[in-house]
């Protein structure tokens, strides 16, 4: 369990990804231009890219209830075909999931537990992009230059409503409405 200062300001959320069988270079290059990594702007976003062996890697879908879909491969395959209907015949060969930590405002939570104890969590699915920056800011602060780190420390991170027992059901209901 987390220390009281930060407990309740993050919540675990399941997120999932699937990989298709190799699609072949020509077919794969027709899906995503310049082999870009892509994410949409939906609140619960989809993200995708091609692997080195021309598989479609497609992620997204979340579980706020801490229950995984019964069949992750089928769930992610359906989401993928919604975005790429031309992949309806592509077989999903790998699928997996895990937890990320989200914050109420979906911004990473950086701060100090004491003068020399720093933390960074709650990257809300943006960890690949932002953890390197957070590590650099913490390193600067440890070395005595904390101005940039302190900018993030001033962001107001509210606790999830409902306390430890009701926050997950409350979020599930809110997302069902959304």
Where are these regions (language model features)?
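Active-site substrate-recognition segment that forms the wall
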Residues: 1-115
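C-terminal lid/capping helical subdomain adjacent to the catalytic/cofactor pocket in oxidative enzymes
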Residues: 115-119, 123-178
């Amino acid at each position: 369990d987390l220390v009281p200062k930060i407990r309740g300001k993050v919540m675990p959320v399941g997120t999932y990804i699937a990989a298709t069988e190799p699609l072949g270079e020509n077919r794969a290059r027709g899906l995503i231009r310049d082999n870009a990594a892509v994410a949409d702007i939906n609140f619960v976003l989809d993200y995708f890219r091609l692997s080195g062996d021309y598989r479609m890697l497609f992620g997204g879908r979340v579980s706020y209830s801490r229950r995984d879909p019964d069949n992750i491969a089928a769930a992610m395959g359906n989401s993928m075909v919604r975005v790429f209907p031309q992949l309806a015949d592509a077989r999903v060969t790998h699928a997996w999931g895990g937890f990320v930590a989200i914050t109420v405002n979906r911004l990473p939570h950086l701060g100090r537990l004491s003068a020399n104890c720093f933390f960074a969590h709650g990257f809300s699915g943006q960890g690949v992009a932002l953890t390197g920056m957070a590590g650099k800011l913490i390193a600067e602060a440890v070395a005595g230059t904390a101005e940039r780190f302190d900018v993030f420390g001033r962001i107001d991170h509210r606790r999830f409503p409902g306390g430890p027992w009701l926050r997950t059901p409350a979020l599930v209901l809110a997302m069902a409405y959304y």
